[in-house]
Amino acid sequence: MGKDRNLSLNSPESIQSVIGDTDIKIAVIAAMWHEKIVRGLIDGATREIVSSGSHAELFRVPGSVELVLACKKLLKTFDAAVALGVILRGETDHNTHIARLVLSGITDVMLALEKPIGIGVLTIDTEQQGLDRSSGDYNAGVNAARAVIRMVRLFR
């Protein structure tokens, strides 16, 4: 019987046993806004990808909206992508519209190309929330990378 493909995203020790040595190529696409937070997401995602035996290549885009087009173009030559960014609440509801646009766009790309995209786009109220979710025990970049690796493996 095949390997168990329903492992929890919260079990880092299991990723190597599920994936092993692979040739998975993953584009890590990160927005440039809120660099300190995004850097934590990048570090977590790339560390997770490399530790699985997969290949990570980093691409930077101006902001979270640009993640959508970058995912679409890069998925022509990559097996999967991890999209990383930060959308910080301001004094208006602009962040809500941007978040919807980005998440809807990424989902549309994923479904159209039938390739997985791990979403590590944080929608936060404060910078501290972003720092908390991009480091330590809960790093959204790590979780996005784990999810995308498992999805690639599921469909191989």
Swiss-Prot record:
GO molecular function annotations of the record: 6,7-dimethyl-8-ribityllumazine synthase activity
Entry binding sites for (2S)-2-hydroxy-3-oxobutyl phosphate: 91-92, 133
Enzyme Commission (EC) number: 2.5.1.78
Domain of life of the native organism: Bacteria
Signal peptide positions (record): none
Keyword Transferase found: yes
InterPro entries: LS, LS/RS, LS/RS_sf
A GO CC term attached to the entry: riboflavin synthase complex
Alphabetical list of Pfam families matching this protein: DMRL_synthase (PF00885)
Residues annotated as the enzyme's active site: 94 (proton donor)
Keywords in alphabetical order: Riboflavin biosynthesis, Transferase
Catalytic activity: (2S)-2-hydroxy-3-oxobutyl phosphate + 5-amino-6-(D-ribitylamino)uracil = 6,7-dimethyl-8-(1-D-ribityl)lumazine + phosphate + 2 H2O + H(+)
Positions bound to 5-amino-6-(D-ribitylamino)uracil: 33, 64-66, 86-88, 119
EC category name: transferase
Pathway membership: Cofactor biosynthesis; riboflavin biosynthesis; riboflavin from 2-hydroxy-3-oxobutyl phosphate and 5-amino-6-(D-ribitylamino)uracil: step 1/2
Cross-referenced CDD domains: Lumazine_synthase-I
Job of this protein: Catalyzes the formation of 6,7-dimethyl-8-ribityllumazine by condensation of 5-amino-6-(D-ribitylamino)uracil with 3,4-dihydroxy-2-butanone 4-phosphate. This is the penultimate step in the biosynthesis of riboflavin.
Family membership: Belongs to the DMRL synthase family.
Protein name, as recorded: 6,7-dimethyl-8-ribityllumazine synthase
Organism of origin: Tropheryma whipplei (strain Twist)
Name of the gene: ribH
